[in-house]
Each structure stands twice: as structure tokens, then as C-alpha cells.
């Protein structure tokens, strides 16, 4: 019967019985695997330990309840400061403590200069400083006065003071102390307060006396001034400089001192007229066509006025339109025809009556002409109430190419109506001479040409 049994089945039963016995005998905690079962090349993904995989039953993550708590490795008394060092005795102090002790023990030596200062300001004998140095700080509280710098400092470290400054301050304070010593305490306090307030008041007073500039010019700006030749009861002359810029276009005032140093030039055949532009030469011409007018050569000469005159006058709209025509293209005065008249500038835009220039009163000065690109406009009529003077007039001439040029003369030729909406413009005296023949044109033709030119200029500026 036993021989007939299969040996394989018997072996299987034996293995099962052995495994059951091993499971029963196994301890509650995790069993440490034998060294032959551990493979250092394996790493568990759950706990991160080497020697087993995540499927292994030895992983502490699977049998967490049976995991062992890591025990302490024992106490190390060497790391714990159970016996701290005792403080060093005073008999053998260290180098740092020795220096510190010497500074605290020895009192701060007071020189005779400091004693004199203490006696001056406090009126009491100086107190003896304590060994810890606190008395010196308390006794010098009253020395902090705003009257001036003092060489006395209350810090423990004494700074280096220049001997020259120390001697000077000592003499000043000693002289001041002799005066204060004879006064009562109330007067001392009042003097100290006044001395502390003195520098501030002087500073404010000096700041108040500083003149502030009225205008600030942005870059070199040409000036244009027109001055009448009418007589006035007040006497003197009034000049209104005009400064034009690209952005603002406002009129600004020029100082009268800048024109006193200019040389005087006299012209021979010039009638007494008045214009002045800061330029050696400028061109102006008026054209009836829609195109931009070509410029005619103009040059100015100078002449002394007989006496200073003053006269307010207004500018008609036709004169303003004529003065705002195209910009000059060449500023080289040819020797042919020399005339002075209104010229325009690319920097000057259209002005409104609200932009009125300021007025400076000064005696007349004859000045040479300089190059300018400003528009010069003036009235053709004198002010009411002026007697014995010739009014200003503008003479317009027709050139060969059909253009117009203007010049100032003394004899009256025609009168244009004044309008209240025009603004004022004046300039210093400049007389002129003209070598070209004069051709008189009726005012109606002139006004028509000016209106056509101004309309064409407006259309060109709009297109640009």
C-alpha cells in the first residue's frame, strides 16, 4: 500500500506542514531576513530601504504595527555643559577686560579750557565726575546751544580737534563769557535765545533780498521792437520787445541795459522814421498769387532821433495779415535795393490780442541792425493829442517781378482805419535809406494783394 502511493504528493504534504509550523512559531515582530536573502541591488519603493522590494513581507510599511520604534543610542555627557567654567578672577583678568576696567576706573581728565566753559554758561563750579562717567554726560546737557560750534563733546571717546579751531573758539567763548557773567540769569536766557535765532533771521533776510528773474528765455530768441517818433507830454520813450518761440509764441520783455552798449550809426539820406529789428538784414515781399511770395532784398540803416517821443498806437488787421506772410528764405542782403520793413519768422505763429507784451521805460538808444526773422507791424496813424510831430507811414513799392516791398517814411501817404482788436507792437528807433525808385500804389490795390496773400498762406499752412 505504501509503495503504491505517489511520492510527489507526500512531499507536498510535508512542505505544507512545515510552513504551517513556521508561521505558528514566527514572532509577533518583523523577522530579520537572513543575509543570503538580502540583495543590496534591490530597493523598496515604499520605504526606500535597500535589500528588499515592495512585494517583500519584510517591508516595514506592510507590517507597520509590528515595526520597531528606534531606541536611543545612549546619553553623551561630553556634549552637555554640566560643569561650566567659573568667571575669571580679578587678579588675572583678560586683555579686553583689563582695558575696559582701566577706562571705567580712571576718571576723565578735564582740561582748563572745559572748566572755563562750564563756569561761563552754568555760573556754578563744575561738579566732580563720577567714576563711571555718568556725571560728565549730565553736567554737559546745558552746553548744547545753537549759537555756534563748540569743541566740547560729551561722548566717551574724545575726538581730535584742530588746535587752530580750538584756540579761536576758546577766545570767542571766553570773550562772550565775560559779558554773560555780569548779567542776570533772565538776561542770559534772552541773549542765548536771540543768538540762536539770529542766524535763521539773517538767512531769511538774505533769501528775501535775492532778486528772482521775471522771465526765463528758452534758448537764443530774436527780439523785435518798434518805436514811434511822436511827441508826448510825459517825455521819454516806451519800448516793447517781442520774443517769439516755437512752442509758446508769447511776447516777453527785454531788459533795457542790453541796448545801452550798442554803437550808433548815422545814415545820410534817410528820413526820420522808426523801426528796429535785431538783424543785419531781412527780406519781405508780398505776392498776389496763391504761391509763396519770393523775398525782395531789404537792408536797414540807422539815425539818431531828435528827442525821445512816446505814442500808443494800434495795428489794423490788414497790417497784421501782411506781417504774417511767408518766412524769409535768404537772409543775405544784396547790395541793390536796401529797404527796411516787416519780416516774418518760422518761429512766430499767429498771435491773439490776449498775448500783450509788457512795457519797459527807457531813454532812446541808437543800435545797429542784426539779422532777425520776426514780423514787424506798426500803426500808420499817430496818437491823438500829439502836436508838432510827423506821423509814421509805411511806403509799399511794386517791384519788377510783380512783388511788393515795404519801407518806412516820414511824410504821410495814406491812412488805414484803426481797429480796436489789434495788439500793440513797438521797437527802438532805426532809420533807413532806399536807393530804389519809389512807385506809389493806391491803398485799395495794396489791401487786395495782402488779403489774397494771407488767404493763400493760410491754405498752405493747413495743407502742411
Swiss-Prot record:
InterPro entries attached to this UniProt entry: FAM90, Znf-CCHC_6
Residue stretches of biased makeup (Basic and acidic residues): 74-89, 97-114
Domain of life per record: Eukaryota
Taxonomic placement: Eukaryota, Metazoa, Chordata, Craniata, Vertebrata
Gene: FAM90A10
Family assignment from sequence similarity: Belongs to the FAM90 family.
Region (Disordered): 1-42, 69-373, 415-437
Organism in which the protein naturally occurs: Homo sapiens
PANTHER family named among the record's database cross-references: FAMILY WITH SEQUENCE SIMILARITY 90 MEMBER A11, PSEUDOGENE-RELATED, PROTEIN FAM90A1
Record's protein name: Protein FAM90A10
Bias (Low complexity) ranges: 180-197
